[in-house]
Each structure stands twice: as structure tokens, then as C-alpha cells.
Amino acid sequence: MDNYEGSDPWNTSSNAWTKDDDHVVSTTNSEPSLNGISGEFNTLNFSTPLDTNEEDTGFLPTNDVLEESIWDDSRNPLGATGMSQTPNIAANETVIDKNDARDQNIEESEADLLDWTNNVRKTYRPLDADIIIIEEIPEREGLLFKHANYLVKHLIALPSTSPSEERTVVRRYSDFLWLREILLKRYPFRMIPELPPKRIGSQNADQLFLKKRRIGLSRFINLVMKHPKLSNDDLVLTFLTVRTDLTSWRKQATYDTSNEFADKKISQEFMKMWKKEFAEQWNQAASCIDTSMELWYRITLLLERHEKRIMQMVHERNFFETLVDNFSEVTPKLYPVQQNDTILDINNNLSIIKKHLETTSSICKQETEEISGTLSPKFKIFTDILLSLRSLFERYKIMAANNVVELQRHVELNKEKLESMKGKPDVSGAEYDRIKKIIQKDRRSIIEQSNRAWLIRQCILEEFTIFQETQFLITRAFQDWAKLNSNHAGLKLNEWEKLVTSIMDMPISRE
């Protein structure tokens, strides 16, 4: 994935503002994006009414503030407040007091950040057992195109729902598709899992494909239910609890699809905690997500190939067993018992070899079942999480743009017009009021878009923070991989040792 240099709002290199007397000029000619969000947004007053008629109170940062970008955190965001010099105090004492206050603010901010991070990470436990089971209903519906139905059962009581003995609903693939579309509308800056592909026609009757799709749907819904935000969504809970046909319910019900930022304001506490390093970490992750996915996909692919090789080994050993059995039937004809009584002992040992092949074949078959049933899903779930993170990167790049830079420039130009109109008797009062209303509208838009940009920043930081917990999925996957291989290698070794001991008395001479 390309880095976000130059087009990403986390980048600070292309968004600087410079002040020249009373004029503010942008130093970049880039297209409108979050790069242009101006000012130390901490100074914006969200409590100021948006319809005020005052020209310079509460709507915009001052020109001094506009020198910095919202994405440029090289200076203390609160450095402009609470730092005035106290009269009648020596200069060196003032510096000490200011430094002490700054150090105290930094320490408090660090402590708040640590608490915030720990609290966010505690809400996400990807290693927890799945709480949703999906089973395919054998009977297929549909006149022209047959479709599969799924029994979706939750094993525990769901949040914000009344206890019920009946925990099973019937859903179609299209219902899962609707749910994901709703989640994307409501939470565009969250890690929304992907769905397995849907195929039409004869492929829908392919049992292997249907099995993979069912497993993919199970991973999707369980990832949703492990997400601290998505799991409490009312439509997710509706999806899991409403027993009626969901298509009919959607036609009758009225539900809200507005995104989670509606009527929400950024907290001052979060703005105090913010650090530029978060943006750098985000961009580093974005730059390597494709490589990470490719490497992990290849690891998972090798695991699946290993499973197929073991299955091939099972088939070969079954064939080997049949051949040994058939061969033991013809040996008495090659070596008549009347001349070779040792052939009976050899045949008895061939029966032991046949039993060994049967046992080791059974062990290998059990190994493939454990790989496909328990081990492989642990690797694939991490693939799904990486894919959801990459999709978040892509949506962020597309949807996080705004035109704050242009609005600020527009406000400054209109303010200059108002200044030039003062004292001129030939100026229309209606024109003056019109420009004034435009300024107020632009200022309102700046505050709204800047607030949205900060909410996006907070949302994405939350997602990237809970994503850090998924590193332990790597640990669990390889631990289980090592245990599985060790256990089955031990079982196979034990069978081989038993075979060696058993056939050591096999005749090697007539004596």
C-alpha cells in the first residue's frame, strides 16, 4: 500500500500555514483533504452558538493558531493557555514556573494516555471463544435459484437483550450482506470484517464451497461480536434475535443508518492526550499492511498444502495396506508351506505391518481433521483481521477528506471585503449582510468539519489500539500448530517403535 505522504491528514509536512500581517496564506496547492484542517483545534470553542453575529469570537482560531495544522503536534496543544507571565516575579522564576507547569501537564497527559489505552485494550479479547454457531439447513429454498439458509445460534445472553430460552434464528447470505452494509454506514472508520464471497448457479450446490462459506460467515459474525463497539449495535442484536424473516422485518421497520459521529463532539481530554507518534505508527502500519497480508496468506496456504499432503499420505497408506494384504495371500503359493514353514511367520508379521499402516493412517486422518477444524481457522481469523484493517485504511483515505483549508481562505477574503466596505456610503447594506452570513456559514462548517476530523482521529486510534491485542492471535496459532504436530509426531513415532519391536523376530533364515 502506498504511504500517505502528501495526501493523508496524518501527514504534517504539506499543511503548514504562514501568517503575513493580517493575511493567512496556505503554503500548499493540494486538493481539499484533511491536510487542510487548520489550527490548534484545542482552542475552538464548541459551546459558542453557531448563529452568533459577532465577527471574531468563537468561530475560528486566531491567525496565530492558524500557523499550525491540526495534524502538526510539534508544539504543546495547550501551550497557548494558562501560560501568561505573572507580574512582579523575576524572569528566571517565571521560566521555572512555566517549565514546571508544562512538565506537570506532560506527566498528567502521559498518565491519562496510559489509562485510556489500557481501558480501550481491555474491551477487546480476540482470544475468547466464539459465541455464535452457524449451521447450514439442509433444505434449500427458491424457485429459480436455490439458496441456503443458516441456523444462527448465540451461546450466551447478548448485551442489552432480554433473556430468552430460544437463541436461534434463520438467516440467508443476503441478510449477512445487509448487516455488513449497515455497519459500514454506521461505522465507516471501524474494522468491519469481510464476508466470504457469494457465488451463483451450480457453484451454490458445491458442498465444499458451501462449507467454506458457512465457516467464513461464522468468522464474520464472531469478529463482529468480539468488537467492543459493533457487538452493542442495536441492528446487530436485532440480526441475532429477531426470529421473523429479516427481509420482511426490514421492509416494515424504521431504523437509523447515520454514522456514529452524528451529534457527537470531541472531548478536550482526548485532544490533550494526542501525540504525533500515533500518526507515524498509523502510517507505518498502512505502508506494510499489504506485505503483512501476503506473507500471512502464504503461511496459511502452506498449512493447507500440508493438510492436503497428509490426506494424500492417508490414501497411499490405505492402498499400501491393501497391497500388503493381497501379497500375503499369494506368498504361500510362491513358498509352499511343505518346503518353507517360515512363510507362515512372515505372513503373520505382514499382518502386523498391515495393522500398523491402518493405525498410522487413522492418526494421519485425525491430524487432517484437527488441522482443518481447529488449527487452520486460527490462522484464517488473523487474515480476516488484517483484511478488515486494510479496508479501514482504504476507507479512511477516501472518506476522511474535507475542505477546511479552502473555507479558511474564503473566510479571510470575505473579512477583507467587509473591512473594505466599512465607511463607504455607496455600499449596499444587503450586500454587507450577505457576506457576513457567508462568513458565519463558513465558520460553522469549519467547526463541524474540524470536529469530525478529530472524531475520526479518535475513532481510528481506538481501532488501532484494539488491533494491538490481535498480536496474541499469532502466538495462539503457532502454539497450537506446534502442539498439534508434536502430539501427532509422538503418536506416529510410538507406532513405528512398536512395529520395529514386533517384527524384529521376523524370520531371516531357516535356522
Curated annotation (Swiss-Prot):
CDD domains: BAR_SNX8, PX_SNX8_Mvp1p_like. It is a peripheral membrane protein. One of its GO terms (molecular function) is phosphatidylinositol-3-phosphate binding. Residues 1-36 are annotated as: Disordered. Disruption phenotype: Fails in retromer-mediated sorting of VPS10. GO terms for cellular component: cytoplasm; cytosol; endosome; endosome membrane; nucleus. Residues 25-36 have a biased composition (Polar residues). Keywords: Cytoplasm, Endosome, Membrane, Protein transport, Transport. The keyword Membrane applies. GO terms for biological process: plasma membrane tubulation; protein targeting to vacuole; retrograde transport, endosome to Golgi. It is found in: Cytoplasm; Endosome membrane. InterPro entries: PX_dom (IPR001683), PX_dom_sf (IPR036871), SNX8/Mvp1 (IPR028662), SNX8/Mvp1_PX (IPR035704), Snx8_BAR_dom (IPR045734). A 1,2-diacyl-sn-glycero-3-phospho-(1D-myo-inositol-3-phosphate) binds at R172, S174, K198, R213. It comes from the Eukaryota. SMART domains: PX. Residues 128-247 form the PX domain. The PX domain binds phosphatidylinositol 3-phosphate, which is necessary for peripheral membrane localization. Homodimer. Forms an autoinhibited tetramer consisting of 2 homodimers that self-interact, wherein the membrane-interacting BAR surfaces are sequestered and the PX lipid-binding sites are occluded. Interacts with VPS1. PANTHER family: SORTING NEXIN MVP1 (PTHR47554:SF1). Belongs to the sorting nexin family. Present with 2210 molecules/cell in log phase SD medium. This is Sorting nexin MVP1. The lineage of its organism: Eukaryota, Fungi, Dikarya, Ascomycota, Saccharomycotina.
